[in-house]
């Protein structure tokens, strides 16, 4: 006896719906080891994202400004396809990719309306890692 076609498999392959959003928020998380760029709409729903590691950089090259620039360009191109024209940029972290990610988004033709630093600053919370001696 033949099996009936599985509807669950057909549901998994459905076409992705493109959102048409004019303005959004770019969250740039710049750590010492990697840079993560997520572009969301105003409600916080992710439209696109990219990382330095996902852009093809491995090891210590992930933590370079150029890797952050390439990742920001990748996330920005997908966001432009979703209709993004204006962006607020929220930067978190002390990493080397902070400025270059913002410049890359600006060079794509996206208008940046606001740049905000949302790096969490402790009110003397956890003890930081010990200083490196080389």
From Swiss-Prot:
Q: Name one Pfam family in it.
A: Ribosomal_S11
GO CC annotations, alphabetized: ribonucleoprotein complex; ribosome
What keywords are assigned to this protein?
Answer: Ribonucleoprotein, Ribosomal protein, RNA-binding, rRNA-binding
As one GO molecular function, the record gives: structural constituent of ribosome
Query: Coiled-coil region(s) at which residues?
Result: none
Q: Which HAMAP family match?
A: Ribosomal_uS11 (MF_01310)
NCBIfam families according to UniProt: PRK05309.1, uS11_bact
Q: Which protein family is named in the record?
A: Belongs to the universal ribosomal protein uS11 family.
Q: What does this protein do?
A: Located on the platform of the 30S subunit, it bridges several disparate RNA helices of the 16S rRNA. Forms part of the Shine-Dalgarno cleft in the 70S ribosome.
Subunit organization? Part of the 30S ribosomal subunit. Interacts with proteins S7 and S18. Binds to IF-3.
Protein name (Swiss-Prot/TrEMBL)? Small ribosomal subunit protein uS11
- What gene name does this entry carry? rpsK
